[in-house]
Amino acid sequence: MNAHHLRKQLRQQRLRLSKRHRNRAAYQARRGLNRLQHPALTGKNVKIGIFADAFGEMPTQPLMDWARHRGYSIYLPVVTGKHQPLVFIEFTQKTWRQSRLPKHPLGMRQPEKGKMLNVAALDVLFMPLVAADKIGNRMGMGGGYYDRTLAKAKSKPLKIGWAYDFQLVEKLNANPWDITLDALITPSKLWLFRRYLVSKE
């Protein structure tokens, strides 16, 4: 199956899920967060990039609640232009619920103002995806925002995918410019793609 048809099929499959199924999957996946060990998650003033789900992705509210409980600073990606890298604006207590955020013309919710960082300043970045494979290749929505943003970064955060189990496929045909994941968290498993990551059982 080519990339276009795979992307279309998996996006449709996500959209068919009930709200109850989505929320249950997200809370099951949250358990994988507690098994992930990395220095980026244990330092002081940890800055984490988290996307606001808008296109049928596994809900990120449990992920944000986890980060808040751990005392991490949360930053949401913001699109500033079609061919521009993403910037990240702090998601504060005043704008905690995603439903209160303004909606971008592309469909996702994002803050309009706040403390802004580029991706190199983040310690960890949770990335949306349509599909990932068992060696960490990632297929996004097709806009290339994350690939462009990370390609230009002088340093890169720990890159973690957040997705349903059915979004994991055996192998993707990766392009040279595609940014790979360091780890993937699904409802049933924590996948580690880099040797320096450790799973705490």
What positions do the PLM features span?
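N-terminal active-site beta-alpha-beta segment that forms phosphate/nucleotide-binding
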Residues: 1-118
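Conserved phosphate- and dinucleotide-binding cores of soluble alpha/beta proteins
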Residues: 83-201
